[in-house]
Structures are given as C-alpha cells and as structure tokens.
C-alpha cells in the first residue's frame, strides 16, 4: 500500500505544478491583449448532432460538463475502492476522516454565509469553500517526500475522498436545474442496464462505456449536472472479477494520467482566467471573495480540527498510530486548497448570475487556496522530522 501511495503522490506532485502553470497562463491571457482571444476561444460554439440528438454548447461548457464527468468518474472509482478495500473500509479507519471532512465542509460554508447573509444571489455560493482539491492537496504534501508518515498521507487521502463524496451529494441536491422527466427516464434505464452488467459479472469495460455515454447524455439533458453520470458509472463497474483481476482499478490507473496531466489543467486554464483590470480594492474585499478565501484559509482548518478533536475526546474516533495533533493541524490547513473543485462549484453556483460573481468566486478561490497551500506546506515542513533524523 505504501508503494501505491508513493506512486500516486509522485504523479499528483507533477500534476500540481502543471495546474499552477495552467492557472498562471490563464491569468496572463485574461489580463493581456489576448483577453479577447481567450474569452472568444472558450465561447466557441461546438455542436454534436447524431440523428435527433443535438448538443450545442460553448467550449467552456463542454469542458465543465464533459471532461469533468471523466474526472468525477475517476473520483467515483477511488471512493468505491476506498470504501470496499481501502482506508474507509472499516468504521475504525473511516471515523476520524469522516468527522474531519464533515467539519471541513460545515464551518467554511458557515463562514461564507456569515459574510453573504441576506443576499440570495451570493448565498448560492455557500458550498464553494466546502470543497478540497484532492490532487492539489496531495501534490503539495508530496513535495515533502519521505518525511511524511504513510499514516498521515492515508488520513489526508481518506479525508479528501469523503470531502469529494460530500461535494457529489451537494451538487446532486443543490445545483440541479429544472428536471426533464423524459431524460430522467432514459437515465434510469441506462442505470438499470449498468447495474445488470455488474450483477451478471461483466468485466469488459466496453458495455459500461456504451451505457455510460447514453447515461451522460441523458443526465446532461435532464437538468441534473452531467458530472454525476461519471460517479454512477464508477459505482457500477466491478471492483473484483472472479479471476481476482480488478476492472475498476484498471480503469482508475488508466484515467489517472489523463486526469492529472490533461483534464484538470485544461479545466484550470478554462476557469481560472479572471480579468483584474476593472476590479477595485472594494471589489476584492466584497463578501464573495472574502467569504470564500476566509472559508478556505480559516474555516477548513478550524472545522477539520474542531470536529476531529471532539470525535477523539468522545471516543468516536482515534488518531492514527504515530500521529499527533501537531501533524494533523497543518494537514487541516492543506484541506483549504479548494482550487479546481471550488472553481467547479462556483461555475454551477453562479451559472445564471452576472459573470462578475463567477470572477469574484474564482478570485476568492485562488487567494484562499494559495494561502492554504503555503501555510500547510511550511507548517507541515516545520513539524516533521528533518531528513536523516
């Protein structure tokens, strides 16, 4: 397990650097003479027509609805594996990261709502600081290499996966638009087909892919966010075949490099470009960016630490062997790296609002995530033993 985690983190570390480059490139283009080209490129209409089916969306929405569905497929595969065989497969293992993740979602959301109380438009962004970017958080931790105990890596991985599960539930419940009955019926039929494949022990990924594509289109047309199709597909793919092989893990390993080196950087490039030219100091200090930034920087670590501490004191959970509160605290700070996940929720929360709110949300996410990453990295570096000690 330690080797698998090391391989995973080494890939995430490189991906984290690529994400930073993508964000920097997006900000550079959005604040340069190329800003018009940048916005025009993302607004390019892309049409796919097959018979009566007609999908017609700007490139930005193809990225957010299509590529991110593959990312959520990967998240679903990771969640299923951890629930059945990994760090969340027993109550003892799952209890502490579960309480930590709940606190890490509730407190940041509360801080955001405190700053945006009374404004029904901006209140829609309450879930933005509740998210943790698993790839970026693990990538920052990976920079410290072998100094980080395996138990601490597993704790962050488990916490981030539960956080992702919470985000999936939030999207399903709070960020779905008017529902189409016909599309939901088609989606339900596709889900029944996927479950039947699983129950029959079908291990070939091709049938899951065909039904999964039908499900994605139906969910896209239904008013439920299309990324949830990826999670449903993941939960239907068998973890273990009769011969001991794992179709689920095979797909997970195949998707990881695509997610790390293509999907997330492309998403970051498409969503992180915020034009700063028309923003005053008053705008930067407005409730949306401040609520998000403080929710990530302060709300995340406070929520994670508070709920973890109470759970341990009430004997509902226990600290991992060899890990103390001084190691948990900087990891709690790293959970404030919302980055791509927070930006994704922002794109849903303010989809129908003035584009300015989306820009402010992305700016708050960038500020909060960068500070959380710096605080978490240097704090953890300080409390961990030096190399060779």
Swiss-Prot record:
The chain crosses the membrane at residues 17-37, 59-79, 95-115, 124-144, 154-174, 177-197, 213-233, 261-281, 292-312, 328-348, 363-383. It is found in: Cell inner membrane. Its main location: membrane. One of its GO terms (molecular function) is sodium:proton antiporter activity. GO terms for cellular component: plasma membrane. It catalyses: Na(+)(in) + 2 H(+)(out) = Na(+)(out) + 2 H(+)(in). It comes from the Bacteria. One of its GO terms (biological process) is regulation of pH. The keyword Cell membrane applies. It is a multi-pass membrane protein. Pfam families: Na_H_antiport_1 (PF06965). PANTHER family: NA(+)_H(+) ANTIPORTER NHAA, SODIUM ION/PROTON ANTIPORTER NHAA-RELATED. This is Na(+)/H(+) antiporter NhaA. The lineage of its organism: Bacteria, Pseudomonadati, Pseudomonadota, Gammaproteobacteria, Alteromonadales. The gene is nhaA.
